[in-house]
């Protein structure tokens, strides 16, 4: 029973992460598939480029919330149910598995043929529940780099570094540290085309559009 319930909680995490907020926003507000515009991502940055600021704020907020909910549901389970259902020792690991599932769902949504965003907002949403101090430190590093460079992708990668420094520096539980490493590598991989443009000096700054649609 413990394995079945754990699998269900992880599945719920994935399905929550898979809710295609950016895609639905583009469809509702402009009648477009945002995957065919800008960077092709359904995340808030591409929504900002293709639709506008208010839509981007909405998408960012919902993407944060759905990832937070995926983790909160696991924590609530251990709060309201008897440890006999799922061993208490599983808690940190199950929280992290559900968190990773939510992050994966955001970028590989089952509702969008396994396409989606780049999992930055969903990762931050998870961190806000796992450890708000780590989340705020990560957000601070992101905003600091953004203010200096005006490049979202570079700021996101800076945030990845900050997550891992803070997780290990604050001696967080092993599952949380592994979350930082695994998701950090995944988010960096999702930004591989951005990294190429950064090296070429062609990565757009905040407010600019890509020179080539779908790039």
Swiss-Prot record:
Keywords, comma-separated and alphabetical: Cell inner membrane, Cell membrane, Lipid biosynthesis, Lipid metabolism, Membrane, Phospholipid biosynthesis, Phospholipid metabolism, Transferase, Transmembrane, Transmembrane helix
Single GO term (MF): acyl-phosphate glycerol-3-phosphate acyltransferase activity
EC number(s) recorded for this UniProt protein: 2.3.1.275
GO CC terms of this entry: plasma membrane
Pathway in which the depicted protein is active: Lipid metabolism; phospholipid metabolism
Localization, UniProt: Cell inner membrane
Major localization class: membrane
Sequence intervals crossing the membrane: 1-21, 57-77, 85-105, 126-146, 165-185
Catalytic activity: an acyl phosphate + sn-glycerol 3-phosphate = a 1-acyl-sn-glycero-3-phosphate + phosphate
Any one biological process term the GO annotation gives: phospholipid biosynthetic process
Mode of membrane association: Multi-pass membrane protein
InterPro entries, A to Z: G3P_acylTferase_PlsY
PANTHER family: GLYCEROL-3-PHOSPHATE ACYLTRANSFERASE-RELATED, INNER MEMBRANE PROTEIN YGIH
Family (UniProt): Belongs to the PlsY family.
Functional note: Catalyzes the transfer of an acyl group from acyl-phosphate (acyl-PO(4)) to glycerol-3-phosphate (G3P) to form lysophosphatidic acid (LPA). This enzyme utilizes acyl-phosphate as fatty acyl donor, but not acyl-CoA or acyl-ACP.
Cross-referenced HAMAP family: PlsY (MF_01043)
Subunit organization: Probably interacts with PlsX.
Name this protein carries in UniProt: Glycerol-3-phosphate acyltransferase
Species of the source: Crocosphaera subtropica (strain ATCC 51142 / BH68) (Cyanothece sp. (strain ATCC 51142))
Taxonomic placement: Bacteria, Bacillati, Cyanobacteriota, Cyanophyceae, Oscillatoriophycideae
Gene name for this UniProt entry: plsY
């Amino acid at each position: 029973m413990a394995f079945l319930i754990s699998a269900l909680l992880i599945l719920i995490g994935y399905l929550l992460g898979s809710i295609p907020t950016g895609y639905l926003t583009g469809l509702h507000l402009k009648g477009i598939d945002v995957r065919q515009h800008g960077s092709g991502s359904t995340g808030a940055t591409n929504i900002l480029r293709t639709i506008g600021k208010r839509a981007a704020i909405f998408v960012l907020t919902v993407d944060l919330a759905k990832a937070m909910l995926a983790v909160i549901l696991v924590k609530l389970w251990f709060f309201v149910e008897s440890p006999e259902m799922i061993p208490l020792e599983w808690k940190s690991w199950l929280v992290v598995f559900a968190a990773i599932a939510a992050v994966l769902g955001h970028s590989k949504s089952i509702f969008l043929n396994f396409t989606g965003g780049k999992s930055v907002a969903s990762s931050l949403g998870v961190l806000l529940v796992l450890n708000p101090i780590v989340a705020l430190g990560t957000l601070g590093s992101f905003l600091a780099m953004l203010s200096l460079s005006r490049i979202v992708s570079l700021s996101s990668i800076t945030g990845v570094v900050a997550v891992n420094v803070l997780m290990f520096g604050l001696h967080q539980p092993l599952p949380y540290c592994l979350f930082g490493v695994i998701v950090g590598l995944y988010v960096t991989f999702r930004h591989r085309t951005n990294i190429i443009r950064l090296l070429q000096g062609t990565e757009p700054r905040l407010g600019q559009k890509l020179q080539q649609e779908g790039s």
